[in-house]
Amino acid sequence: MRFTFGKGATGQQLSTTAPLLRGLGTAGQPAAPSPGGGTFTDAVRRNVALGRLEDMVAWGRKYSIWPFNFGLSCCYVEMATAFTSKFDIARFGSEVLRATPREADLIVISGTVFVKMAPVIKYLYDQMLEPRWVISMGACANSGGMYDIYAVVQGADSFLPVDVYVPGCPPRPDALLEGLMLLQNSIGSERRPLSWLVGPNGAEKIERPSFRDLKHQERQAAGSLPTPDSV
């Protein structure tokens, strides 16, 4: 906001912005318009950001997701491609790949999850910072894919709380970016602090219901699937 000063009829220094700051004119009338137009309230709205603390925290979290540099098989190639200049994942604030799970809050399960690898993934997930999120990328991570055998876990959600599923074999980098945007929307709409409660074991987070479970009956009742061109 700009402040200007001038001299009155008696030679006294007067501020031409003071009536605007007080919100009243010299004769009790509404303040004169500011240089940008509008009243004092309008000037405050243009120059001061107002909001709730939980909204500011949600805004900061959704645009500063730190993914863990972790991959399993071919889907990791598409994940790595999303970090190149062509797709530019930095637009969404998630370009900071962390080399240790202790500095990350997002893990992307990109590839086939073998039974021997599941305990390792769970161990890495337990070391991540709270709050933490999981993206299941590709058909193998979502449901085992084409490997319906004893050595492959049939879905990463059998041992991890998956937040977003990205379909495809393998999914394009664009699909991963769309999944990241869905995760950001979920993070931004999360209630705070009502989503955390103090229980017998300390602060506990109320788990959101899984859309996979909520839409299970709807998917089972589907008689026909749309063609890939119509999706």
UniProtKB/Swiss-Prot annotation:
Subcellular localization, as worded in the UniProt entry: Cell inner membrane
GO cellular component: plasma membrane; respiratory chain complex I
EC number: 7.1.1.-
GO molecular function: 4 iron, 4 sulfur cluster binding; iron ion binding; NADH dehydrogenase (ubiquinone) activity; NADH:ubiquinone reductase (non-electrogenic) activity; quinone binding
Signal peptide positions on this chain: none
Catalytic activity field: a quinone + NADH + 5 H(+)(in) = a quinol + NAD(+) + 4 H(+)(out)
First-tier enzyme category under EC: translocase
Topological type in the membrane: Peripheral membrane protein
InterPro entries according to UniProt: NADH_UbQ_OxRdtase-like_20kDa, NADH_UQ_OxRdtase_20Kd_su
Gene3D superfamilies: 3.40.50.12280
Binding site for [4Fe-4S] cluster: C74, C75, C140, C169
Biased composition (Basic and acidic residues): 207-219
Functional description taken from the UniProt entry: NDH-1 shuttles electrons from NADH, via FMN and iron-sulfur (Fe-S) centers, to quinones in the respiratory chain. The immediate electron acceptor for the enzyme in this species is believed to be ubiquinone. Couples the redox reaction to proton translocation (for every two electrons transferred, four hydrogen ions are translocated across the cytoplasmic membrane), and thus conserves the redox energy in a proton gradient.
Similarity comment: Belongs to the complex I 20 kDa subunit family.
The protein's name in its UniProt record: NADH-quinone oxidoreductase subunit B 2
Gene: nuoB2
